[in-house]
Curated annotation (Swiss-Prot):
InterPro entries linked to this entry: Ribosomal_eS1, Ribosomal_eS1_CS, Ribosomal_eS1_euk
UniProt-listed GO biological process terms: translation
Organism for this UniProt entry: Cryptosporidium hominis
Name of protein: Small ribosomal subunit protein eS1
Localization in the cell: Cytoplasm
PROSITE patterns assigned: RIBOSOMAL_S3AE (PS01191)
Disulfide bonds: none
Main location: cytoplasm
Entry keywords, A to Z: Cytoplasm, Ribonucleoprotein, Ribosomal protein
Protein origin, superkingdom: Eukaryota
Keyword flag Amino-acid biosynthesis: no
């Protein structure tokens, strides 16, 4: 041991402390834009790392899937039980253009529909739209009591369940095939397919709470920019733009000055 050496004195680290870098300084924010089927077009923002060498931010953003409540997309709280999946297909500047990628129902809504003394009927089928999308649609329905029924239960027989399930598949196939994905999504929002099934199965057994519970996108056609832009224009074929806001100073008048002039 060397004379005069104190072990308690700690040595300084080699190189000193590293400079703390804010992680967000290496990120970029992009706006998310929904198709024109929904009322609210800009529904949020997403984050991605800046371009570094061969790593591009566009590659990290493309094909990202975002799950949004339909209540936020349409400004309607009655549609809060619907969850819409939107997938980023293209990036233009700082805007991500998304496309419909699926639909689901919230767990609490599904549990609120399931009750005793009734029969739950489910069906699913694969359909192909006119623009080349292959979807798998899941339908759910519940039996209900007749108007003059005294018995508390409303169970359907197995033969009736088979007939209802067959009718479900027929109506879903007829409504989905021959239409574009954009028109099909418009049918999902007001539950027009469920109402059609309930009306068609009335003579077999009365139904209630008929919903398209879930939609899966199994396959998509090859990417086409023109098709994507068509889904992002308004109903009149013109791309939607923001309205001009008139400043308050141009509209407001000074009441005191107006009285003095009078």
């Amino acid at each position: 041991m060397a004379i005069g050496k104190n072990k308690r004195i700690s040595k300084g680290r080699k190189g000193g402390r590293k400079k703390v870098v804010d992680p967000l300084s290496r990120k970029e924010f992009y706006d998310l834009r929904a198709p024109s089927t929904f009322k609210v077009r800009n529904f949020g923002t997403t984050i991605a790392s800046k371009n570094q060498g061969t790593k591009l931010a566009v590659d990290a953003l493309r094909h990202r899937v975002y799950e949004v409540s339909l209540a936020d997309l349409n400004n309607d709280e009655d549609q809060a039980f619907r969850k819409i999946k939107l997938q980023c297909e293209d990036i233009q500047g700082r805007t991500c253009l998304t496309e419909f990628h699926g639909m689901d129902m919230t767990r609490d809504k599904l549990c609120s529909l399931i009750r005793k003394y009734q029969t739950l009927i489910e069906a699913h089928c694969n359909v192909k739209t006119s623009d080349g999308y292959v979807l798998r649609l899941f339908c759910i329905a519940f039996t209900r009591r007749m108007a003059d029924q005294v018995k508390s239960t409303c169970y359907a027989q197995t033969s009736q369940i088979r007939q209802i399930r067959k009718k479900m598949v027929e109506i879903i196939t007829a409504e989905a095939e021959g239409t574009t994905l954009r028109d099909l999504v418009k049918k999902f929002i007001p539950e027009s397919i469920g109402k059609e099934i309930e009306k068609a199965c009335r003579h077999i057994f009365p139904l209630q709470h008929v919903f398209i519970r879930k939609v899966k996108v199994l396959s998509k056609p090859s990417f086409d920019v023109s098709r994507l832009m068509e889904s992002h224009v308004g109903a009149d074929g013109v791309e939607e733009k923001g309205t001009k806001v008139v400043s308050e100073s141009n509209q407001a008048t000074n009441l005191l000055t107006a009285e003095m002039k009078a």
